[in-house]
Amino acid sequence: MNRTEKEQVIGELHEKMAKAKAAIVAEPKGLNVAVVTDLRKKLRDAKIDYRIVKNTLAARAAKGTPVEPVADRFVGPTALVMSYDDVVTPAKLLADFMKDRENFVIRTAIIEGKVIDAKGVQALAKMPGLKELRGQIAAMIAQPATKLARLVGTPGQQLARVVGARREQLEKQG
């Protein structure tokens, strides 16, 4: 790779690192091409970048970005997973991926400016994702309206039952 290509890679990585809300640094050892391709597809479908990075280029690209505090962890085989909107989904996908593979190890992560370790990433993976949270919030907002509708309807239903019972009583009497 010549100098121009390296500068281009650094520029591209710097741009992505600057936009990233979450960046997970992992060590992808002993994975075959089919497994990595499957992981890349799952991450790409979730709009998450997965890059095997050259450590020196990644460290240079990280300067002046939110990823800079974890640049010292770019040692040995390094995969960089970056998400630009949802911070939970990459952790969930990687935790799921790691269940069957001992060779894939998370070193560290930076989530919205806060550095967390591998255990923190595992804990983050157990949290509800953005879509789940939105669904829960929508349900919580809709719940009071549903209860109110039931409360408003209940007295009318009770009155209708009383009137119906009185009508039946009068019909039986004659």
Curated annotation (Swiss-Prot):
InterPro entries per record: Ribosomal_uL10, Ribosomal_uL10-like_sf, Ribosomal_uL10_bac, Ribosomal_uL10_bac_type
Pfam family, one: Ribosomal_L10
Residues passing through the membrane, by range: none
Record's keyword terms, sorted: Ribonucleoprotein, Ribosomal protein, RNA-binding, rRNA-binding
One GO cellular component term noted in the UniProt record for this chain: ribosome
Superkingdom classification of source: Bacteria
GO terms classed as biological process: translation
GO molecular-function term, one example from the UniProt record: large ribosomal subunit rRNA binding
Keyword set includes Hydrolase: no
Similarity comment: Belongs to the universal ribosomal protein uL10 family.
Function: Forms part of the ribosomal stalk, playing a central role in the interaction of the ribosome with GTP-bound translation factors.
Subunit and interaction comment: Part of the ribosomal stalk of the 50S ribosomal subunit. The N-terminus interacts with L11 and the large rRNA to form the base of the stalk. The C-terminus forms an elongated spine to which L12 dimers bind in a sequential fashion forming a multimeric L10(L12)X complex.
NCBIfam families membership: PRK00099.1-1
The protein's name: Large ribosomal subunit protein uL10
Organism: Anaeromyxobacter sp. (strain K)
Upper taxonomic lineage: Bacteria, Pseudomonadati, Myxococcota, Myxococcia, Myxococcales
